[in-house]
């Protein structure tokens, strides 16, 4: 199965899928799925965006995609980031927020199906670590606190069988960054995500949030941190064999281009 993992896009859906298709062309493949690590930019109403989003790129492309009912060019699974309309996501019925765009809720898993060879299981914990909210139940969080994941969400996942990929927004505790806005050598303190990897033993973990490309090994699991949209290291391609431990990194998309065929 051919999978493209993508970093934070903050509403730049047009650019994401332009780059995904260009990446396919460069590799000479067609992706079966796109996996997204959160900060997708789910803002159905541009008037509801949070302060950080308002100060940067605004609501982005999602409101128009939603209004027009656009179809994701490739089946896409995403977890929430820390900049989304959490109330809208919580109240949304069903898996798909748009045709082909699947929201993987915290503490849940989804099977990526291949009609010829079976399925690959993806487990997800979106949002970022918040020390003051971590011990609360997820259904107790209100407003902007919903950007945080909670211990009970992790506990719902730890006994899930046969997980191949873990998709998180924040970096598992222990991931060290050579370059980071908090300074070189910054180490993630996102509790619980490292424990989740210890229990699930997936083949690989993808994360975003920190807007930098980084590789790490946590609890014996390969962890790949992805850069933000339009930056080198935003897209990574892997091939994963169903029913085995085999997977390989096919390449990374490094070209930075302007414009969009979806504008």
Identify the residue ranges that each predicted region occupies.
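Active-site environment of divalent metal-dependent phosphoester hydrolases
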Residues: 10-16, 41-46, 79-90, 110, ...
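Active-site-proximal loop/helix segment associated with metal-binding centers of metalloenzymes
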Residues: 115-183
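Active-site-proximal segments of metal-dependent phosphoesterases and phosphodiesterases across multiple
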Residues: 41, 47-66, 161-201
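A short C-terminal boundary segment appended to hydrolase-like catalytic domains
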Residues: 242-263
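Conserved beta-sheet core of the metallophosphoesterase superfamily
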Residues: 75-79, 94-99, 174-246
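Active-site neighborhood of phospho(di)ester-bond hydrolases with catalytic His/Asp-centered motifs
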Residues: 5-7, 33-39, 74-83, 104-105, ...
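Beta-strand-turn-beta hairpins that frame and shape the catalytic cleft
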Residues: 1-4, 109-124, 165, 217-222
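Core catalytic region of metal-dependent phosphoesterases/phosphodiesterases
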Residues: 6, 13-114
């Amino acid at each position: 199965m051919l999978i493209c993992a993508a970093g934070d896009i903050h509403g730049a859906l047009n650019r994401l899928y332009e780059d995904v298709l260009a990446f396919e062309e460069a590799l000479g493949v067609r992706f079966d799925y796109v996996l997204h690590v959160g900060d997708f930019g789910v803002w159905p109403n541009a008037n509801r965006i949070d302060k950080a989003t308002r100060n940067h790129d605004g609501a982005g492309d999602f409101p128009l995609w939603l209004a027009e009912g656009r179809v994701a060019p490739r089946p896409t699974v995403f977890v929430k980031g820390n900049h989304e309309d959490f109330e809208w996501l919580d109240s949304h019925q069903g898996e798909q927020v748009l045709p082909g765009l699947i929201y993987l809720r915290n503490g849940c898993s989804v099977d990526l199906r291949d009609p010829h060879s079976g399925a690959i299981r993806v487990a997800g914990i979106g949002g970022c670590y918040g020390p003051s909210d971590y011990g609360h139940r997820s259904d107790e969080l209100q407003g902007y606190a919903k950007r945080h994941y909670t211990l009970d969400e992790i506990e719902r996942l730890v006994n899930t069988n046969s997980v191949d990929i873990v998709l998180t927004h924040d970096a598992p505790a222990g991931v060290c960054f050579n370059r980071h806005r908090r300074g070189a050598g910054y180490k993630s303190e996102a509790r619980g995500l490292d424990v989740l990897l210890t229990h699930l033993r997936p083949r690989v973990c993808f994360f975003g949030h920190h807007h930098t490309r980084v590789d790490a090994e946590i609890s014996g699991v390969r962890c790949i941190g992805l850069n933000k949209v339009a930056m080198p290291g935003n897209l990574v391609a892997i091939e994963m064999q169903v029913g085995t431990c085999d997977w390989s990194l096919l390449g990374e998309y490094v070209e930075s281009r302007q414009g969009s065929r979806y504008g």
